[in-house]
Every structure is written in structure tokens, then in C-alpha cells.
Amino acid sequence: MTSIDTLWLLLCAGLVFFMQAGFMCLESGLTRSKNSINVAIKNFADFGISVALFWSFGFSIMFGLSQGGWWGTGYSFVDVGGEPTLAVFFLFQAMFCGTATTIISGAAAERLKFSAYLLVAGLASGLIYPLFGDWAWNGLATVAGIETTGGWLENLGFRDFAGSTVVHSVGAWIGLATILVVGPRQGRFPKTGKTLKIQGSNMPFSVLGTLILWFGWLGFNGGSTFGLTPEVPGIMVNTVLAGVGGMLMAGLISLLQDKMIQVEPLMNGSLAGLVAITASANVVMTPIAMVIGATGSAIAYLVGKKMLHWGVDDAVDAVAVHGGAGVWGTLCVGLFGQLPLVDTGLNRWQQCGVQLLGIGVCTLWAFGLAWVFLTLLNRVFALRISPEDEEIGLNVSEHQATTETYELFQVMDRQAKTHDLSLRVPVNPFTEVGHIAGRYNQVMDAFEARHHRSVEDLAQIYYVTAAIAAAIENNSFKADQLGLEEVTNRADELGALARTIQQMAEMLQQRDQELIAVKQQLVLQQQKQHHGNGESVDLSP
């Protein structure tokens, strides 16, 4: 490996690492704000776990000296000192391991315990990913000077250029096993039989994440040549066009189905196109790349719809995008790959058969082992958070990380339960929630002031009524004792006082109704703003 090749692979490793930020933005924006911090920290933590385990023994299993094509040995706790080629190869592959692991995060978002997710991440990066990676990619280690004989799938002719199956499908199948074990989010599939759409908290943030992923994909596919070769520009063009094809197909489907172009299908469609081309970006012609991306997008859409029909709740459609499109992309090596470039010596039907074998083995291995492990673990250690914690949100229940919205709801809940009108919401004047909190405090100031005036008016009425009653009882009712002037007779006096009391009571009742209407209008605005996020606010008196 030349110096320029080493530099190129280092740059591509950085681009793949940047994809972690893309996944974090995408998943945080597609989930509710009460869970966004949890989603972000999962993407951060799983990277640390995956790289640590991959360095400890995962790299050795995947790229060590092959033991009959089933696992590798000899490179545990790998020391790359003085071997730049080995160092850059390890770094690049460690980033791939992190990508496969973080796909799981989005699928099972909003109901999985943080500690349980760390166990899933450890299983994925420490065993499932490196072992299947050995079967399909062990021979790549020769680039780093490791004398190995390749994995058994690889030796049969299975080809997956940059990981449609090895990376993306592995993560998707583990994610599918996880969400089947923990079940759907509360309210996702109500008893009415209809699927409830849970709106994400920040679509622009998700679009930013999609663009970051697209940018990182250039390093993902471009670096899989392990050098700055003449094939790299064509691979990058195929990558971009497949993403574009996926986006255009998703926009067309959305327009036909929903009579408008929605945001989520565009994002998922472009990502599905990128996943699909990942297996064959180096062996297909440019027009075919766009077809592969567009078809992968359509397949991901159909898989996502079918999962909803089956009651499977994937928070970000990770299984459809990375699993469905990953299967299609891997099969495309046999369907559309230029056989001289595929270079396995197989004819097209044989190549398709080997690709299907690899897809099936990956599904059985990744999904099967993850499902068995998590099902058994769930019997002794609850993987899912409690319904109460799910209602509050994982930001608070798992990390004690409050938000302005949560603090606003806390104050409103306390006021509803304690009837303490003196409570006020903390105000940050530079945020939208801060503006809402400020208006809420203004309403409560007015409500409290009117409440005090109402109490004073009622006290005055009580005093006048008590004085009249006492005077009548003592037969000493006199107008001047009550501060009433020019009263002609006792009957007129009592009638006037009765009318005054009635008018004051009606005025107080009308004032209370106005205050209640103002408060209800504010609460309805709050509930409308957060209804799409699935956050409930208990404001019952």
C-alpha cells in the first residue's frame, strides 16, 4: 500500500466515522423530543463499545488467520505500532463495525433500556458482525499483510463489495430481532386496527443526518478499494446516482400514495438506494446503478408497509432500509454485475445462487442468534422500560436529562394537582418553549390577580350579608349602619341589596368563566403542539 493509498484510506475512515453523526441526527429527528437525548447517547456509546470489542477480539475473529474459513485467530488486542498498513486497515474496518452496530439503535428506539441496548451492541460488535464478516471478507486481510485463506462464503464466490449484507443487513436483522422481543411503542397500534403515526420531533435535523450519511457513504464505498485506484471515481458516481435514484423513486411513490411528497419517504428512499448500491458499486455500469437505487427504494417502501401490517414497530424504518434494500443490493451483484469484474469464475445463475446463499446465511445467523439471546435474556432481565418511564420519556427515565418542555409540563401538572396558583415556569427567552412558558406565566399572573380580587369581593359580600342578617335579627336595621344613603324604607333597602349581591355574583361567575376559557385555550395550544410527539400532559384538576 503506497503512501497515497494510506492517506486515501485514512480520509475514507474519517468519512465513515462521520456517519455516526449522521445516524445520530437522523434518528434523533425521527423520534420524539422526550427520547432524543437517549437516542443521541446510544449512537455515541455504541461506537465506543463496538470499537473496543473489535480491537479486543473482533478484528482477530474477522481478519485473523483463518481456521477452515470459519473464524480467524492471532490478532486479539492488535498492536499496530510500526505497521501503518495494518493500522489504517484496522481503523477503516473498525468504523464499519461501528456502522453495523448503530443501525440497531434507530430500529428499537423509544422503548429499550439503555443498559439492554449496550448488551445488544456488545453482542453485535463482539460476535455476530465479526464472525459473519470472517465468512464473507476474511480474504481482505491480505491487504494488510495478513496471510489468510479467506472465509467459506468468500471462497464459494460470495461478493459484497462494501457491505450491503455484511454491514447493513447484519445490523438490520439484529434490529428486527430486538424490536420483535421488546414489542411496539405504546399507542403505535391501537385497538381500532389503524396504525398511529408517531411524528418525529425535528425533520430538518433528520434531513441534515441524511445528507451527512450520504457524504460519509462516499468514503464507505470509495474506501473499499483500499487505495486510490482508477475505479474510485466511477464507484463514487455510482454511489451518488443510486442515492438520487432512490430519492426520486420515493418521491414518486409518495406522490402517488399520499397525493403529496412527504419528507420521510425521501430520506429513507435515498438511504435505501445507497444501501442497495453498496454491494455492487465496483462492478455495475452507471445507468444500472440508478436502477438498483430506485428499485432498492421501492423494495424498502414495500417492506416498511408490510412490517406495519404485521404490527412490527420500527421507529426509523431501519429494517426496511438496511435489510430490504441490503438484500436487493447483494442479489444485484449476480443480476447486474459485470462478471469479469466480479471475477469469481461463476456464470450469472451460479453467482445469483451464491449471493442468495450469503443472504440466507446472514439472515439466519444475525437474526437467529440475536432473537434467541434476547428472548432468553428478557426472561431474567427486562429489556423494555416500564410504561410509566415510556410515558415520561427515556431522556428523564434513563439519564435524568430534563428539557424545557418537560419542566413546563411538571409545573402545569403540579398546579393541576395542588391548585397552587403561585407556581411559575422557568423561562428561557431565547427558545420557543421559553416563549410559551412566558405567555403561560402571564396568564397565571392575571388569573391569580383576578382570583385575589374575587376573594376580596366575596368577603365584602359576606360582610354586607352578615350585617344585614344581624340587623334584621335585632330589629335594628338602619341604612346608615351599612353606609347606605337615601333609603326610603326597609323593603327598598333589602331589595336593592339583593339586586346588588346578585349582580356581583353574576359578575364574579362571568369573570371565572372567562379565566377558565383562557386557561383551556392555552392548554389546548400546548397539547396541539405536542400531540404529534406523542407526549401526554395530565392537566385534569
From Swiss-Prot:
Transmembrane annotation, as ranges: 6-26, 44-64, 86-106, 117-137, 161-181, 203-223, 235-255, 260-280, 283-303, 316-336, 356-376
Main location: membrane
GO CC, one annotated term: plasma membrane
GO molecular function: ammonium channel activity
Location(s), subcellular: Cell membrane
Pfam families assigned: Ammonium_transp, HAMP
Gene Ontology biological process: ammonium homeostasis; ammonium transmembrane transport; signal transduction
UniProt entry tagged with the keyword Transmembrane helix: yes
Keyword terms: Ammonia transport, Cell membrane, Membrane, Transmembrane, Transmembrane helix, Transport
InterPro entries per UniProt: Ammonium/urea_transptr, Ammonium_transpt, Ammonium_transpt_CS, HAMP_dom, NH4_transpt_AmtB-like_dom
Protein family: Belongs to the ammonia transporter channel (TC 1.A.11.2) family.
PANTHER family reported for this sequence: AMMONIUM TRANSPORTER (PTHR11730:SF6)
Name under which the protein is recorded: Putative ammonium transporter sll0537
